[in-house]
């Protein structure tokens, strides 16, 4: 506990300095628009690799376990995001309720996670889940989540990259709490394994504390967009229930370049086959 507090104190000292020093480098050439709640597999892979790079830069600075963003955790994160949308979960709504309860002197306050959505997916893999009591308060084991009141889901590639950058910056250096920073950096873990699997996804839900502003309809202020970063380490995987709906594929996700090369090779093979068949027919 003393070591944990020391780490939190150090993160606090660095927070204001590093937050100002870290800035996203805009790239106006990345102008293609995408719907973050309905991404193609290629774009999911693109953004996952960017998140993986940011995440591992943080881990490297702390000398902690490597993170692998792979297809299985992409599925996990996507399913959690769908759960948020299915439940109409408003993080700002939960925060408003927590403030109301705090004013009444309540100590055990709800937090923003849709723990039911997370537990429902974790259970399919036979992973441990939080108790019903903790679930009702938002308690869970696998998600770091960042929410913005800018409810736009149609963004340029540049804007999505910036949102992911801001997500990790917010996790690490928000200056208010360091539980997210500790989790992302794996700063207080005592486990002996050196791999964690992760995935990133997005969801859009109604903001129950706000309404659309007719003067700024493009901002979709009546909505909120969540960035979900889910992680499962090898220790958690080793403790799964024997009876489970899904297995967990630990295969690494290929790089975009490798995927493009594979697609090109397949296209060339198909073309060669078609050419050979055409020549045979002509003869």
For each feature predicted by the language model, list its residue ranges.
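Long, non-membrane, amphipathic alpha-helices that form coiled-coils
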Residues: 1-7, 11-14, 237-283
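Short, well-ordered surface patches within globular domains
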Residues: 2-139, 181, 190-203
């Amino acid at each position: 506990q003393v070591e944990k507090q020391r780490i939190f104190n150090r993160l606090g000292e660095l927070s204001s300095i590093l937050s100002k020093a870290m800035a996203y480098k805009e790239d106006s050439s990345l102008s293609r628009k995408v719907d973050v709640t309905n991404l193609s597999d290629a774009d999911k892979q693109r953004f996952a690799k960017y998140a993986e790079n940011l995440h591992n830069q943080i881990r490297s600075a702390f000398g902690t376990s490597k993170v692998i963003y792979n297809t299985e955790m992409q599925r996990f994160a996507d399913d959690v995001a769908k759960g948020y949308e299915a439940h109409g979960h408003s993080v700002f709504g939960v925060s408003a309720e927590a403030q109301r309860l705090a004013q009444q002197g309540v100590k055990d306050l709800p937090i923003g996670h849709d723990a039911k959505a997370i537990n429902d997916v974790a259970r399919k893999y036979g992973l441990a889940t939080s108790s019903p009591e903790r679930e009702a308060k938002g308690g869970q084991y696998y998600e770091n989540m960042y929410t913005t009141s800018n409810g736009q889901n149609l963004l340029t590639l540049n804007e999505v990259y910036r949102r992911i950058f801001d997500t990790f910056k917010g996790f690490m250096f928000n200056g208010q709490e360091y539980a997210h920073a500790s989790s992302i950096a794996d700063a207080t873990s005592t486990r002996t394994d050196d791999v964690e699997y992760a995935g990133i996804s997005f969801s859009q839900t109604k903001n129950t504390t706000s309404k659309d502003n007719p003067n700024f309809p493009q901002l979709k202020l009546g909505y909120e967009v969540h960035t979900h970063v889910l992680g499962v380490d090898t220790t958690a995987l080793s403790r799964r229930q024997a009876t489970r709906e899904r297995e967990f594929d630990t295969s690494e996700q290929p790089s975009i370049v490798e995927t493009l090369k594979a697609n090109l090779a397949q296209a060339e093979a198909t073309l060669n086959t078609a050419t050979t068949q055409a020549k045979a027919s002509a003869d």
